[in-house]
Structures are given as C-alpha cells and as structure tokens.
Amino acid sequence: MLYPLIRKGIFALEPENAHDLAIKMLHLAGNPILNKLLKALLACPSGNEKTVMGIKFKNPIGLAAGADKNGDAIDGFGAMGFGFIEVGTVTPLAQDGNAKPRQFRIVEAEGIVNRNGFNNYGVDYLVENVKKAKFDGVIGINIGKNKVTPVERGKDDYIFCLNKAYNYAGYITVNISSPNTPGLRQLQYGDALDDLLKSIKERQAYLAQVYNKYVPIAVKIAPDQTEEELVQIADTLRRHKMDGVIATNTTISRDTVAGMKNADQTGGLSGKPLQHKSTEIIRRLQQELKGEIPIIGSGGIDGVQNAQEKIVAGAELLQVYSGLIYHGPGLVKALVEAIR
C-alpha cells in the first residue's frame, strides 16, 4: 500500500541514482536486526519448494541479474522473500561500463532502457560478498566478459570467472546476450557458441572434481532471435547438456514503445514491453527442448497472471527486476503466494 508513495520519491531521481540509493538502503537492511524487521514488515510466505537443475529452491521466484551487480545487497533483497537471487553480471576485471546517463524509464509503458555495459567491481569483490551473505535461498552468479577483451578471446573471461565463482555459487549463468557490450551477442550463434559451451562444460567437469560438487550452469539468451537462430541455439544447448537456460535478456526492439519518451534511447529494453516477446521465446524453447533443459523465465513479469503465462509456456522458475521497480516488494509476495 505504501509503495505508490515511495515510488513517487524514487521516480523523482535519475534512474541510476535511484538504483544506487536502493542498493545502499538494502545493504543496510543486511544488518540482522533490520533484516528481521524488514522480513516481518513484508511478511512474505516461504512459498512452494521446487527442485530445478538439481537444486532445491524454497520457492520459484528469483531476482534477475542486473539488480545487484556486485552482491552488495543480497541479504536486503533476501528479506523480500525471494527463493533465489542472481547477482552480477560480473567480469574478471572491474570496469566502469558505458558513459552516463545510461538508464531511462519509459513510464507510460512501465519499461526501462539501459545501456550500462556490465559496470561492476570485478569477480573477486562479488565473491567476497557472496561468501559473507546470510541469505537462506540460492545465490546464482551471472558472468560476462570485459569490454576490452576481444570477442574471439571472450571464452577466456568466462573461464576466469567460472574458476573464481564455482565454489561459492548455487548455480552460474553465462551471459552472452546483453546488447550493451559490443559483439557479445555474436557468442550466441554457430561455432562461437559451440566452442564457448564446450570449454565451459569441460571446465565445469574439472571444477566438479576439484571441489567434489556439481554446480549447474545456465545460459542467458536474448529475445531478438529469428526462428532459425532459436532452433540452432536450442540444439547447441541440448548437445552440450547445459543445465538451464534463462529466457530472456533485454530486447533491442522498440515495437511496443514506438513514439514514447525515451523509446529512442540506445540500449536494452526491459519491463512490461518485453512481456509477450519473452513468453513467446519460452514457448518456442520448450517446444524445441521438450523438457530436457529447464527454462528460467524472465522479462516483463509484473503480476500473477503474466507470471502464470510464463509457467504455462514452459518456465520452471521465474525472475523479476523491472516489475519490482514499478510495483515494489509486494510483487514478490504476490508471486510467491501464487506460483507453484
């Protein structure tokens, strides 16, 4: 009930300033006493347990990557009731990302455009935060490549991050679908994807022996695929026996927001305008994968109805981020109560 008032204050700030403030506040909410108070205030139920990728999730609702890039606010977000939190995207080296301003609201469509460019403090910083977290759910770590790394050497960055994150992650996500790192999406196709996933699976097998535990690896894909590209991606994921696929990242399309303020800003569009596009990708992926690889649905979830649509389409877990900005933590509670 309070969130519409809070949102007015948040939306009076520039989007990135509002985000940074929220992260600082949620970092403070990691304090054990404040964390208990926040949990009591939000009163989110524990939800329905679900086992996916061999992991037991206390409920199927997660926080999407991009919200807590450096793992600074894991316990604060955890108090909202999430079953899992995906931190990152993180790269081997710290990097500033693209020039500001780089986040823009499309308020009338409940959308957000970002061209952040994987701004983060580096994988070592993030891993230290993951190690300190008290969150009782699953923590996923989303990994990417540095902007300065040539695409043809991109797999080196993913392997570097995999080595660093493996022992501390509930699962790891390979992000090859952000539109804001030049050339990154090339890694989704053909021999480039084949080569990358082969290297990642080999390293996963090695690390599983070293640490005596198997940490599942998912791949996050874009929504802007042709039919042929999607079929090819699904086939490659299946051949390499990937543990999961996240559908989807942000879109470069502006079909759903044409003519609106900030619609012409360069970057990836998320939120409600992505809702149907991401659900359709989930549906098509499910048809191709036939349940062999679990799908994590992400993109425009802002209520129980469209969350259910993604489950019906084939998603086993769900992630939210933009919907949280527009609707507040009450969204998490509603989804946790409703989604099985």
Curated annotation (Swiss-Prot):
Binding site for FMN: 65-69, 89, 142, 175, 220, 248, 271, 300, 321-322
GO MF entry, a single one: dihydroorotate dehydrogenase (quinone) activity
Gene3D superfamilies reported for this sequence: Aldolase class I (3.20.20.70)
GO cellular-component term (any): plasma membrane
Location relative to the cell: Cell membrane
Function summary: Catalyzes the conversion of dihydroorotate to orotate with quinone as electron acceptor.
NCBIfam families assigned to the protein according to its UniProt record, in alphabetical order: PRK05286.1-1, PRK05286.1-4, PRK05286.2-5, pyrD_sub2
Quaternary structure annotation from Swiss-Prot or TrEMBL: Monomer.
PANTHER family hit by this protein: DIHYDROOROTATE DEHYDROGENASE (QUINONE), MITOCHONDRIAL, DIHYDROOROTATE DEHYDROGENASE (QUINONE), MITOCHONDRIAL-RELATED
Protein name per the record: Dihydroorotate dehydrogenase (quinone)
Organism: Mannheimia succiniciproducens (strain KCTC 0769BP / MBEL55E)
